[in-house]
Amino acid sequence: MPKKFTTRKGDIYTIDTPNEENLFKSVINKNTSEAFRYISQFNFPLSDNIKTIRYFAIDEDKPNNVGTSHSTLSLIAVINNDLETLNLLINFGFDINNHSGINYITPLGLAADKGYKEIVKLLCEQDDIKVQNALYYAIRGENKSIEIIDLLVQKGAIIKPEHIELAISHSNLSVFEYLFEKKLPDIEKNNLKLIGSSPAISSIDCILGEASKYQNTEVIKFLLSSGYKPEQKYIDEFFVSAADNGRLKTCITLKANIEEHTRLEGLSKYQNYLKDKYHDYYKTHIIFLSKFSYTDEPVEMFMFDNESNLLLLSMSRPLRSKLSSKDSYIIHDAIKEIFNNTHLNIKELELARFKARIEFIKITTDEDLVPLSNKLAPLFSPELIHDLSKLEEELFPEVKLAGLAD
């Protein structure tokens, strides 16, 4: 019966022999000299059972799931970012390629995900290293590194269409540009077909569709300014689709490349989206949504009639310049919070936004501050400002048109 061993982090592993337990402890505690001593106690040459030894985590609350999470010694060394111990294990022939754990990740994959460049270099120097699995983690990882991705590609990792999509969905322009350049021959020949793409659509149009879906505005701008600009009909199609699904950042980025009739079609789609999305609040709440302007001029892409009771504020540079810098950041952050957390109660988010603003005003003495409705008055219609003023008074009676009460 294997012995149970609990680490300092609370993880429980099964250990077969005392020497295996000691080796495991030395590796997990980053003690290379002790690891060397315990490895030396095995019979040489090391058997495959020793080289590929795995330590299985136990979930005591779910005993039937024993063995679903497991780690090789090499993976443990990578988890610790322990280059010295990993090098020792490699020199003794311990496995560096086996997938470990429920995430099906290799030591190289984990190192690529974490951005451990020196460990990636060491592993890539090994003749028998398998690199394909690691490319996925390098692209989507916590610390994306072009250097690591290039090491893997130079070692033989094949860039596939799904890697392009992964770079788009994880919003990293530099990684996308690297992969785009590497796959340019396929893109030019329309051989790069993303998952679910139609054979009738070119590679560049497929990429724009993915960027539009994930609202990756940097990639969209890159494509529109490149020598491989997508067809106009697809630019229009993706604009309307984005409006239909409430993807404002995509709409803003594509707006300069569409005709007025397409914009109006998008407006209709977007109004219907808001009615469906905010049905419970449509008649009773004002919803603030950021339009993320990317130009020096206010973006008036979508406007609503007064009956809709929906207020769409454009957080463009001119608007921000008319507000105090700190105040505008509070507003902008709150707007993004609402935009990204639409499953939450809109009323509660509005309360939080005004509370944040009031707390800011209370501790600020270096400028003349007035209620938000007053600051916005020069920029919007009287009817719109009236609605905003009413909301301020409803939520916080201490907010008056002349300023905050003491």
UniProtKB/Swiss-Prot annotation:
ANK repeats: 68-98, 103-129, 130-161, 163-189, 203-232
PROSITE patterns, per database record: ANK_REP_REGION (PS50297)
Keyword annotations of the record: ANK repeat, Repeat
Gene3D superfamilies: Ankyrin repeat-containing domain
Superkingdom field: Bacteria
Protein's name according to its UniProt entry: Putative ankyrin repeat protein RF_0266
Annotated organism of origin: Rickettsia felis (strain ATCC VR-1525 / URRWXCal2) (Rickettsia azadi)
